[in-house]
Amino acid sequence: SPMGRKGWPAPFDTDLEARKGLAYELVDGIALLSKVDWRAKGLDDLGRPDGFHERQVDRWTAFLERIKGRELPGFEVAAAWLRAHKPLDYVPGIMHGDYQFANVMFRDGAPARLAAIVDWEMGTVGDPKLDLGWVVHGWPDDTDAPGDEFASYVDMTGMPSRSELLARYAEVSGRQVDDIDYY
């Protein structure tokens, strides 16, 4: 990952075609992870997949109540929307919980190759599409000129678009992404 440095390492700093590979490898990592048979791997006790989405809304609402320093207009509306609009399909799988460039490592040089996913303290069996949502929530659709509204700790120039990443995830994982706005 580019953490602790200014910009991407060579050749990804100047080779925009190679840089695209970083994003595809990032998404392939969680897409492939979502396909792991977690029961066969003995991970039955890693999480509680039943009622996962309901618990998430309750958990984060309660957390906010404990730390709230001011009113957040619209928060209750958002929580109610999440409770009323479940994902189209929920297929439990292994999820990281904080999946992003900062929590992956790539092999040195091109082509981009994902080497490791690190920082697993929020890992669980839940909805893997939450990881996808975390990756694309601020991802620009026009990465040729991302603009200041998409300021990020990584240079997004030359990366695949948000739509291209969603299509890639669907292709590799076999999961639909039509309900990505939920995430």
Predicted features and spans:
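C-terminal, non-catalytic tails of nucleotide-sugar-dependent glycosyltransferases
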Residues: E76, A84, R168-D179
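Activation of the activation-loop gatekeeper triad in protein kinase-fold domains
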Residues: I117-G123
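Hydrophobic residue at the +6 position relative to the catalytic HRD Asp in the kinase catalytic loop
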Residues: V104-F106
